[in-house]
């Protein structure tokens, strides 16, 4: 059992004083408060009100976690007023206290908005923020801000030097296509480096800049990545991963042995995040992909999440020696709904990330702290058989706020659906739409029905389906929203991706689903494939939701394991009377464990 350090104790005292104060961002909810809306999440990060989008500058400093985020303090819509940096602090990544905005558009170099960027801890434990400012001429420039009092655990005040911008708009880049500086890393030559997204002469590019002092920056002649096909890319994230094990690495880690790098890019024309594992040479500032056959068009790279997320951002959590990922999950109903709720946008539940043994893909898993929210448990008998058409309810949990883990055993793959045309396997989302949960298959569909009404007129299906092409099997994972709501005007697609694993060898597949009212996050195959969805069922206004396990394949499957837990409500930017969890917990949890 670890002891709380002095920094954490000091942070606890500061948070106690903070929570005793009042602010428009952190007031106690009332009957009419937007926090009481039926679709508001219970343990996902979101401000008390108004618009949020990209996660920015997550870091751990002086015993506290910090999350900044794109925030509109004026409206639940993006385009009413100019964006600021929202700022919240936590001791456990679950419970959050909202602070006043960290950066506001008050200077000529950011007069029209403080857009996305990153945080870096400089020598001397000085936190620094690099961010994109929309200047008085509405051009995108890169600015720096420093913590005014680095010893303040809450980092409540930030200084924007008058010498900003530190990187002006380049002559070969349009004024609206130069943004999102990354977390900085130190090269072995002692120079700081950052990646910045830009469109250079019509080519989507990830530029590298170098600096001795974090103020004067020089651009590398060659980009880290460039593609004529992809369109504008955003929010670049270059970070190291260990070749073996689950531990994270400091962003500046490099070396010939034991370290790979990941380049993640967010693509505007698809609103999706893509990544490639490879090697990074800091002498030339060059990235070499491990799968060059995927090409320069990052839309053919691996997907970080096959669902409704964008603008992801990771950081190295030095406290737990892990890399943690956030991503923005926007609403998918209407702007009128945003205004009526008074808020828009949530962040995904934080995920631990590490490199799979194949050296090509990342594994993602909810951080272990979620176990502290688990309350009532329910499940099924091990070995429960699900025959063709079986639908079995899991009773005993509040299924609108739950954590569900299930492992399916596939007795045989003989009835897997045959696919003769390989082109049908190129678009998994289209395949999920054609082969939804209601379409009878051979091996699958089998999985979960979540946020379901008692009559099943509304439900979200999260499931697997096995296909066979020649002598190889392909495991498809889908989240089917077509029956998620009876409302018109709600985006209800079928999301999907292939799980990169040998299902013929294992014949077992795991599924973990986090349910949080309007958010459904699913992790297939131990985190090999992830799908995030936003759902808006109508029945929640008058009745409770239900949880089912099902099989609509002609072949039976077995439930080797199924456990479901109620999850408690975290304190997320709305004060409810105490500050439990806002300091780092003394109890260390067990190491992360995953199954196939």
Swiss-Prot record:
The active site is at residue 54. SUPFAM superfamilies: Arabinanase/levansucrase/invertase (SSF75005), Concanavalin A-like lectins/glucanases (SSF49899). Its EC number is 3.2.1.26. The gene is CIN7. It is an enzyme of class 3 (hydrolase). Substrate binds at residues 51-54, 70, 78, 115-116, 179-180, 234. It holds the Pfam family Glyco_hydro_32C. It comes from Oryza sativa subsp. japonica (Rice). This is Beta-fructofuranosidase, insoluble isoenzyme 7. It is found in: Secreted, Extracellular space, Apoplast; Secreted, Cell wall. May play a role in sucrose partitioning during seed development. One of its GO terms (cellular component) is apoplast.
